[in-house]
């Protein structure tokens, strides 16, 4: 038994060194490191199948969101929907969002943030301009090339016991690369325009461009403007950051005229976390049921935690905020720490709306800090709305990472976030979302909010 354990550890060390040895010389994230797992994170067949089918559901949700916004503008759905989604946006951006040229355009990369809780999956938000495409592509490629006889998998408690032999990562070695390439159709040249705000992701996108090969993909600074007819642009910058992308106006004009292909489209509605609050709003249930279909409608409600838009508009004295039984958002400050299993976060169109910025877990804050966050959310409603979301604590998983300093495998109890990447190819109703790969971020058990950090393990997922 001792000899077998030692042999297993030697094999794990070998795999971890192999992974580290494949790191591109330019790195993947500027100034960011993570813990290396010797194995993929194993989901089990049932969860893997759930993720494979989830892309269809989320694409249909985006279609429904797009339609809801348009119908709200036309007066065929409640006017307050568009009014809330438009809060804080400049008129030029709203004009683009409402332009006939972009009428049916949807993001072609869909990445949900999923937590594995004791009650199943929880989708906390959707990202239409996600980082991690290159990282996940590199992880898939690297772990697919581990020595076949040694492959194993880290797994969460619901997974079957891992066996020796081949464990294929979800999406395969090149699923992320082929998926990303597919979203640009027949474009001969694709310009990936990266803002300074997103500059940390430049190395991973440069790696993607190099792997796809040739001169098809080009990494461009925000000042780049030499676009040719028939080319495509991948917008790797958030819409709040347009002031720092000097030629964003030209990009949008060329896309509107049909001279270039642009994704994601210049539609801030898809960068708003309040979409989940609209999903939960009972006034809109019939719309969602009709546009999603009963099966997808029910699945979204199983996955999405209850979400509220923190709108300080006065309620009638006999009315209350659903589920919370509060008659005024100021009363949110009076909840006990135990009652504050709630996440408060900026909805969108803000430098604080991505990553772990602008995210407050009520049960993890003092009364004073929680009160300050609530006051800020109420005060900023007109130009930077916030949402409140029920917090479902991720369950514990067993993981391990390799300590290169001490040359040993370190077991770790952790909590995991799954980020599947869906790539949408095809046009209009023929468009389909394909799963390219799944990134697991495993943070130590004492971390309440899961995000990329030096103490986190990044690993691709296998079934």
PLM features: residue spans?
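Preference for protein termini
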Residues: 1-463
């Amino acid at each position: 038994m001792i000899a077998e354990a030692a042999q297993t550890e030697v094999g794990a060390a070998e795999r971890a060194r192999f992974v580290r040895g494949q790191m591109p010389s330019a790195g993947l994230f500027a100034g960011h490191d993570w813990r290396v797992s010797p194995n993929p994170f194993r989901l089990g067949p049932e969860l893997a199948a759930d993720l494979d089918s989830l892309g269809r559901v989320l694409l249909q949700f985006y279609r429904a969101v797009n339609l809801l916004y348009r119908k709200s503008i036309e007066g065929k759905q409640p006017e307050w929907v568009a009014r809330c989604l438009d809060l804080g946006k400049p008129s030029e951006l709203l004009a683009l969002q409402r332009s006939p040229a972009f009428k049916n355009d949807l993001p072609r990369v869909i990445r949900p943030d999923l937590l594995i809780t004791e009650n199943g999956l929880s989708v906390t938000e959707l990202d239409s301009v996600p980082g991690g495409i290159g990282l996940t592509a590199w992880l898939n490629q690297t772990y697919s090339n581990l020595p076949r006889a040694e492959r194993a998998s880290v797994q969460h408690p619901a997974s079957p016991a891992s066996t020796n032999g081949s464990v294929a990562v979800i999406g395969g070695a090149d699923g992320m690369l082929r998926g990303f390439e597919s979203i640009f159709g027949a474009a001969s040249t694709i310009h990936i325009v990266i803002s300074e705000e997103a500059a940390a992701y430049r190395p991973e996108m440069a790696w993607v461009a190099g792997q796809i090969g040739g001169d098809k993909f080009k990494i461009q600074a925000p000042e780049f403007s030499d676009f040719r007819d028939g080319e495509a642009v991948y917008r790797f910058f958030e819409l709040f950051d347009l002031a720092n992308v000097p030629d964003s106006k030209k990009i949008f004009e060329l896309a509107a005229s049909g001279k270039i292909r642009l994704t994601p489209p210049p539609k801030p509605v898809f960068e708003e976390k309040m979409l989940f609050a609209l999903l939960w709003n009972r006034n809109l249930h019939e719309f969602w049921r009709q546009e999603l279909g009963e099966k997808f409608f029910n699945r979204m409600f199983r996955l999405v935690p209850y979400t509220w838009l923190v709108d300080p508009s006065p309620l009638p004295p006999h009315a209350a905020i659903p589920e919370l039984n509060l008659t005024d958002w100021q009363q949110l400050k009076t909840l006990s720490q135990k009652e504050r299993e709630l996440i408060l976060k900026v909805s969108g169109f803000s430098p604080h709306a991505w990553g772990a910025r602008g995210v407050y877990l009520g049960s993890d804050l003092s009364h004073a800090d929680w009160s300050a966050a609530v006051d800020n959310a109420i005060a900023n409603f007109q130009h930077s709305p916030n949402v409140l979301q029920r917090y479902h604590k991720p369950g514990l998983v067993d993981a391990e990472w390799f300590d290169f300093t001490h040359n040993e495998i370190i077991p770790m109890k952790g909590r995991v976030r799954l980020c599947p990447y869906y790539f949408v190819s095809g046009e209009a109703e023929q468009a389909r979302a394909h799963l390219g790969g799944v990134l697991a971020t495993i943070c130590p058990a004492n971390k309440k909010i899961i995000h990329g950090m030096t103490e986190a393990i990044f690993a691709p997922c296998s079934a």
